[in-house]
Amino acid sequence: MNQIEVRNVEKSFKDTKAVRGVSLTIQPGEFVALLGPNGAGKTTLVEMMEGLKKPDKGEILIQGKNWHKHEKELRKIIGLSLQETRFTEKLTIRETLRLFASFFKLGEERVNEVITLTELESKEKSYAGTLSGGQRQRLALAVALLNHPEVLFLDEPTTGLDPHSRLDLWNILKGLKDQGKTTLILTTHYMEEAESLCDHIIILDEGKILREGQLHELLDENSHNLDELFINLTGKKLSEEPQIK
């Protein structure tokens, strides 16, 4: 069974068509990168997959189930980390994770597991308000992993991070990939991030899929890497360095 199936989905906001007839399938255990410039429709597409927005047309199935009829079941297998995740500044990392774990009726054992998984042991007593950008992103990932999600959505998780913090997060995600139990859908502006982490690449622009497939299938004699492929498809350069936080 496909992990995710998107069938001819469309979404508009007033006079702007954000997503135009998108169809795709994602298999269990795949790490998928959604690439596109601002306004390409990738965030809207992901929010529909997450059940946060409803398509105007078409259907999205996760493990063969749609959000309309099976929201309660699907919430149990989904993890998500938004680009601007905010935490209560006066709670420590461990206290924050205990709070979110209580929503899933999970105990201290799972809190310990995600602290270890996201390499936050040395910071678990630090208050959220004192964390660096990289540490906040690792905390956001730890929260997203609490309920053992089968499908994990990350919205530009390393945007604005320094290169060292970015590499730390990549290594954590590579470890998650090696376990083979999680499907990841990642939006990113970093071609290197997509090439390093993901085996399934989807390039969007103006609400449509321009190219999709395995990385080695997408590259050819005219496009030796994702940067070149993206420029050839869109005439735009995606991987501009954002301001470091």
Describe each region flagged by the PLM.
Residues E212-G213:
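ABC ATPase "signature
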